[in-house]
Regions:
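N-terminal targeting signals for export/organelle localization
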Residues: 1-52, 178, 199-202
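Thiol-/selenol-based redox modules, centered on thioredoxin-like
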Residues: 31, 155-202
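Short loop/turn microsegments at loop-to-beta-strand junctions
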Residues: 50-51, 73, 153-155
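Short, ordered coil/turn segments that flank beta-strands lining enzyme active or ligand-binding pockets
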Residues: 58-59, 161
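Short active-site neighborhood of thiol/selenol oxidoreductases, capturing the structured segment around
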Residues: 63-86
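Conserved helix-turn-beta segment immediately C-terminal to the redox Cys motif
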Residues: 71-72, 87-113, 128-129
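Short, internal strand/loop/helix patches
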Residues: 111, 116, 124-162
Length: 202
């Protein structure tokens, strides 16, 4: 008499399937954990080297952050739909004009990186409305935001002459307050006394 065929079904396959799924889940979690640790380790913070990037200006030219090495750079990440960004834009322009019109002007720059998806169509009316004269760059795919690991807009990074992040500011500021204008002037003068490629700020 032929013995009955063994029952095929989930009872025999389930343990193996469960083990395989568990192993895959553990591997994925370990991989994500390593990625998260790696991202935290390179998060740009004050004292760290500012990550280089390139982006397109309104006129179509490509600009790299490293092209401005030797200047103090205010990197402002913003969007036209952001109300706090709109509130601080006039004071950024006033700060720009005050310092650029003085003896330290050639050593100072503001880069405003827009994360607007529509880029030029959204930014041009904003630029005209507030009479912005500093360079505006487009980051519609969010690459610069990811590099700098921003959590919202506006976020601003002050980068010294040596290319290191001096300060990180989350949220809007009244950028042309007298004490801030003097602080920026001090950072520019301080950097001028150091050779290019010198140490990071303390």
């Amino acid at each position: 008499m032929t013995p009955p065929a063994p029952e095929a079904g989930p009872a025999r396959r389930s343990p193996l399937l469960a083990v395989a799924l568990a192993a895959a889940l553990v591997a994925a979690m370990l991989g994500l954990g390593r990625l998260a640790l790696r991202e935290r380790a390179v998060a740009p913070l004050p004292g760290h080297r500012a990550p280089d990037f390139k982006a397109t200006r309104i006129g179509g030219e490509t600009l790299r952050l490293s092209d401005l090495r030797g200047r103090v750079v205010v990197l402002n990440i913003w969007a036209t739909w952001c109300k706090p960004c709109e509130e601080e834009a006039p004071s950024l322009e006033r700060l720009y004009r005050k310092i650029r019109s003085g003896p330290l002007g050639r050593d100072f720059e503001i880069l405003a990186v827009s994360i607007d998806a529509r880029s030029r169509d959204a930014v041009l009316p904003f630029q005209r409305k507030f009479g912005l004269t500093f360079p505006i760059l487009f980051d519609p795919d969010g690459r610069v935001s990811r590099i700098y690991q921003t959590t919202g807009v506006p976020e601003t990074f002050v980068i010294d002459r040596q290319g290191s992040i001096r300060e990180k500011v989350i949220g809007p500021r009244e950028w042309d307050r007298p004490e801030l204008v003097e602080w920026f002037s001090g950072v520019i003068r301080e950097g001028a006394a150091k050779p290019a490629g010198g140490g990071r700020p303390g």
